[in-house]
């Protein structure tokens, strides 16, 4: 979706509701499991593609926008889980093989003192802002059919791309979990249903920001569902400790809620 120069200037001057990815985005654990998808270059961006098991296809397509950890094992396994629910899933590596964990393994990792996190974010945001619309168009042309519908999901860094798609015509429904980089216009401009999966503890999308986002959604009569889990932090839907029964349950419930949301709206 393109923006006029005046609209771009206004959006740049807005303050963030969900702040840019910060130190909380560097925390997490790597999950065990073998991903089953394949890789393909689409619109000059490496893309992970995972398909539903035979006989479980629902005919619909899910676009996946990753968090700052990029195409790491947890993300691939989550995409496979969406495929298990019947979706053809495609996720693009807009970090181009340069996820944040290559530079910092966690928020206390200072082994690379020259790493400039702010410059890293600026570099990859600039690329993703241009690459995502082209990539979505290419996916639609290559994989869309006369009967297929599109959904999209984004984690952290990927949240604004979900909102951008939900103001256009390609995607029918969307969802994000523990978002970053969101401003008021992302909520004001929505034309399609949005699922918000959030954590009680989140310095990126804190309580006042969540309340403001909900106020915008309600005032503008948007279609949405708000889910919040107590006792977990930013990153819960992708990077929680799977040896902790509650964190595992939260991750699974977030995904199940998103799938149910997609299934409903894509059946209408």
Where do the model's predicted regions map?
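N-terminal cap/leader regions of alpha/beta-hydrolase-fold enzymes
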Residues: 2-268
């Amino acid at each position: 979706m393109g923006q006029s120069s005046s609209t771009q200037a206004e959006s740049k001057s807005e303050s963030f509701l969900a702040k840019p990815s910060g130190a909380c985005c560097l925390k997490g654990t790597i999950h065990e499991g073998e991903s089953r998808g394949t890789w393909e270059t689409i619109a000059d961006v490496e893309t992970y593609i995972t398909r539903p098991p035979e006989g479980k296809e629902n005919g619909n397509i899910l676009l996946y926008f990753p968090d700052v950890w990029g195409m790491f094992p947890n993300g691939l396994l989550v995409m496979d889980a969406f495929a298990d629910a019947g979706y053809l899933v495609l996720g693009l590596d807009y970090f181009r093989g340069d996820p944040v964990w290559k530079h910092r393994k966690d928020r206390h990792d200072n082994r690379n003192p020259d790493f400039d996190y702010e410059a890293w974010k600026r570099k990859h945001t600039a690329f993703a802002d241009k690459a995502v619309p082209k990539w979505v168009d290419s996916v639609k042309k290559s994989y869309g059919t006369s009967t297929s519908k599109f959904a999209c999901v984004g984690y952290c860094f990927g949240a604004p791309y979900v909102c951008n798609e939900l103001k256009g015509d390609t995607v029918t429904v969307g969802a994000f979990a523990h978002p970053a980089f969101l401003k008021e216009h992302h909520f004001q401009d929505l034309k399609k249903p949005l699922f918000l999966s959030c954590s009680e503890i989140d310095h990126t999308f804190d309580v006042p920001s969540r309340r403001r986002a909900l106020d915008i959604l309600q005032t503008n009569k948007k279609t949405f569902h708000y889910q919040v889990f107590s006792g977990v932090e930013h990153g819960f839907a992708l990077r929680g400790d799977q040896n902790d029964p509650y964190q595992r349950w939260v991750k699974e419930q977030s995904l199940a809620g998103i799938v149910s949301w997609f299934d409903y709206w894509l059946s209408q």
